[in-house]
Amino acid sequence: AVAGEKLWLLPHLLKMLLTPTP
């Protein structure tokens, strides 16, 4: 379950890193 959660969070984390936030 942990691996699945990480795979689900991966795109979200990348989006956060790539998105310019103040």
Curated annotation (Swiss-Prot):
GO CC list: extracellular region
Functional note: Antibacterial peptide. Acts on the Mycobacterium abscessus subsp. massiliense cell wall. Reduces 40-50% of the bacterial load in macrophages infected with different M.abscessus strains. Is not cytotoxic towards mammalian cells, and shows no hemolytic activity against human erythrocytes. In vivo, reduces the bacterial load in the lungs, spleen, and liver of highly susceptible mice intravenously infected with M.abscessus.
Protein name as it appears in the record: Polydim-I
Keywords: Antibiotic, Antimicrobial, Immunity, Innate immunity, Secreted
Cellular compartments annotated: Secreted
Tissue and organ distribution: Expressed by the venom gland.
Keyword Secreted among UniProt keywords: yes
Record flagged with keyword Secreted: yes
Gene Ontology biological process terms, A to Z: defense response to bacterium; innate immune response
Organism for this UniProt entry: Polybia dimorpha (Neotropical wasp)
